[in-house]
């Protein structure tokens, strides 16, 4: 995307996010109770995680948020996954403005060469889950497309009230995808439905309008967390199963 177009899109999204936050504070949607329901997670050191990381959770917040915004459901999921119950998960969240930093962090867990990964290499690589809110939805799919160029699969992508010019098509390396959107002042700009680059490779799990949610509070919809946790549980079950033929 040209820098001028990116800047124009980012500024528009940022200004409208401000307006949305002012007109529709999260408390107005009755979802703030979800914040207190998220337990504080015990933290395992990054070095310990990197040594045993089998699943990567990479989240992107909205354009106006700090990457560690405690009110964002994207961040809250990551905090849970950094707890002692998930020693095999590496989880981080980033601003969409520095989405390449998130990509670089993710790729540190993969072979260093720049070419396509072989099936043998992928057997020893972590599984990837991507979640993005607002302009973070665009950032998330930008990461997925970069991974596609190396044949790195993505187990799950979730777009949450996504805002962006190139966030309509889910790339073929994504196995399952979902989109959640709200009815609020940003509605004219947010992505409502997705296209699949290759329907034989990608399955849409959810296309949901979250009633009563605003552009910020939608990130705390429990179904988003549930999709992430279900995917992790399924991946863990696959790790435990013996290879076919044994």
Spans of model-derived segments:
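Bacterial N-terminal signal peptides that target proteins for export
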Residues: 2-14
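Bacterial N-terminal signal peptides
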Residues: 12-24
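Boundary at the C-terminal end of the N-terminal hydrophobic targeting segment
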Residues: 28-30
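Active-site catalytic motif of lipid deacylating hydrolases and related acyltransferases
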Residues: 33-34, 42-126, 215
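Conserved beta-strand scaffold positions in the cores of enzyme catalytic domains, especially
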Residues: 57-59, 88-93, 157, 177-179, ...
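Extracytoplasmic/secreted proteins, especially bacterial periplasmic and envelope-associated proteins
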Residues: 72, 76, 101, 105, ...
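Serine-dependent carboxylesterase/thioesterase catalytic core
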Residues: 81, 88-89, 106-194
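C-terminal catalytic-base region of ester-bond hydrolases, centering on the histidine
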Residues: 172-246
């Amino acid at each position: 995307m040209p820098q001028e177009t990116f800047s124009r899109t980012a500024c528009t999204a940022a200004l409208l996010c401000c307006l949305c936050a002012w007109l529709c504070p999260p408390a107005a949607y009755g979802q703030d109770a979800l914040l207190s329901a998220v337990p504080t997670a015990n933290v395992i050191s990054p070095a310990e995680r990197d040594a045993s990381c089998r699943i990567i959770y990479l989240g992107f917040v909205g354009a106006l948020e700090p990457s560690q915004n405690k009110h964002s459901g994207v961040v809250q999921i990551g905090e849970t996954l950094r707890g002692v119950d998930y020693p095999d998960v590496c989880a981080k969240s980033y601003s969409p403005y520095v989405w390449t930093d998130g990509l670089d962090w993710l790729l540190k867990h993969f072979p260093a060469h720049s070419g396509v990964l072989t099936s043998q290499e992928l057997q020893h690589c972590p599984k990837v889950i991507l979640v993005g809110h607002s302009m973070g939805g665009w950032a998330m799919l930008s990461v997925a497309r970069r991974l596609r160029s190396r044949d790195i699969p993505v187990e799950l992508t979730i777009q949450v009230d996504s805002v962006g010019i190139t966030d309509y098509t889910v790339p073929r390396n994504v196995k399952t995808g979902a989109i959640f959107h709200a009815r609020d002042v940003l509605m004219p700009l947010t992505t409502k439905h997705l296209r699949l680059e290759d329907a034989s490779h990608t399955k849409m799990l959810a296309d949901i309008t979250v009633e009563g949610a605003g552009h910020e509070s939608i990130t705390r919809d429990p179904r988003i967390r549930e999709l992430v946790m279900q995917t992790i549980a399924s991946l863990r079950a696959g790790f435990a199963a013996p290879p076919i033929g044994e």
